[in-house]
């Protein structure tokens, strides 16, 4: 985990993420110590990122007809308890410059949903692994943490979509690897990935196809914390890291130590991956969550949040409940 001073330095360079994602522009201008990062021109607009704990989030109004659909047990408690990972990299879910407040696009979308449902948002900061257990047990009502819809996850959870999912292949800046676009490109490489993620499924599928074709197998290494896999990448213990495109693009831009050599849909080659809010299977919450998402998509609040975090290119036209997900892994 970066120190507070290192975190501040990284967050001060946050606008670079959006330049990396768009492939345009020049370097950023750091902001003041107040936590409001300096302006950065992107196309014809100027983007300002607030990394202070006082987020002034985009808010939405309650919609009584949708709020009435929330299961009575949750509605009666007056809170929407959202499981979220808070130790990641911008712009998804990360800590503000007070090193304790969870901010990012995930918590902002969760706030909009809670508003429409007439509930107070309570964020439950947890690990990636514990997030699934917390939702399954009912400890958390819903998970917002860059979760991709998969067919296997749909056996246990319900999903309401709110973003498209793109993944990136990230290498050291001086790596001889220049492009990863097909399974053969990773044959024989040492690749890190998060356990239990959709990118792990894609990686294992590509490796299986390589083995079947007689190519060298991938050496898969598992890391959950960014500090760990980036140290492994820098030291040469791994050749490539495979993770979410927004966070990888951010790291490549602000560190100067890595580069993006390819991207792929979070659903693999057969389907466009979709990021979704995750609820307990059959508990009745997923439909009002989806309705709330469609409300803020239609009234423009959703677009405001995505624009705020530089993720307008990951917008969807409508939220769906339990759409086709990443295919089951063949055994």
Pin down the residues of each PLM region.
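Bilobed "Venus flytrap"/periplasmic-binding protein-like clamshell domains
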Residues: 87-89, 100-116, 147, 165-225, ...
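Extended ligand-binding regions for polar small-molecule ligands
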Residues: 35-65, 115-116, 177, 197, ...
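Extracytoplasmic small-molecule ligand-binding "clamshell" domains
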Residues: 31-145
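C-terminal motif of bacterial Sec signal peptides marking the signal peptidase cleavage site
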Residues: 18-21
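A ligand-binding cleft/hinge motif common to bilobed small-molecule-binding domains
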Residues: 147-154, 203-205, 235, 239-271
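Bacterial signal peptide processing site
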Residues: 23-26
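Periplasmic-binding protein-like
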Residues: 164-171, 253-291, 312-331
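Acidic, polar ligand-binding/catalytic clefts
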Residues: 120-185
């Amino acid at each position: 985990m970066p120190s507070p001073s290192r975190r501040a330095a990284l967050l001060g360079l946050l606008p670079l993420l959006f330049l990396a994602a768009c492939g345009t522009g020049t370097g950023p201008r750091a902001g003041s110590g107040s936590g409001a990062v300096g302006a950065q021109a992107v196309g014809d607009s100027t983007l300002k990122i607030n990394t202070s704990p006082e987020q002034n989030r985009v808010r939405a109004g309650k919609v009584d007809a949708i709020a009435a659909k929330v299961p009575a047990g949750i509605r009666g408690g007056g809170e929407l308890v959202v499981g979220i990972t808070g130790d990641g990299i911008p712009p998804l879910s990360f800590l503000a410059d007070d090193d304790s407040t969870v901010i990012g696009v995930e918590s902002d979308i969760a706030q909009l949903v809670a508003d429409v449902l007439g509930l107070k948002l309570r964020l439950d900061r947890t690990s990636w692994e514990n997030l699934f257990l917390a939702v399954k047990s009912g400890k958390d009502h819903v998970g917002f943490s860059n979760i991709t819809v998969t067919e296997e996850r749909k056996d246990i959870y319900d999903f309401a979509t709110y973003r498209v999912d793109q993944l990136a292949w990230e290498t050291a800046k001086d790596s001889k690897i220049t492009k990863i676009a097909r399974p053969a490109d990773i044959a024989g490489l040492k690749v890190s990935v998060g356990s239990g993620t959709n990118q792990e499924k894609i990686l294992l599928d590509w490796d299986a196809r390589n083995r079947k074709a007689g190519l060298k197998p991938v050496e898969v290494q598992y890391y959950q914390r960014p500090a760990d896999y980036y140290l492994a990448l820098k030291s040469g213990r791994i050749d490539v890291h495979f993770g979410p495109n927004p966070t990888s693009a951010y790291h490549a831009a602000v560190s100067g130590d890595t580069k993006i050599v390819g991207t792929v849909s979070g659903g693999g080659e057969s389907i466009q991956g979709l990021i979704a809010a995750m609820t307990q299977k059959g508990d009745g919450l997923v439909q009002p969550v989806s309705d709330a998402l469609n409300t803020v998509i239609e009234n423009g609040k959703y677009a405001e949040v995505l624009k705020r975090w530089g993720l307008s290119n990951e917008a969807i036209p409508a939220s769906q409940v339990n759409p086709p997900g990443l295919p089951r892994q063949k055994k």
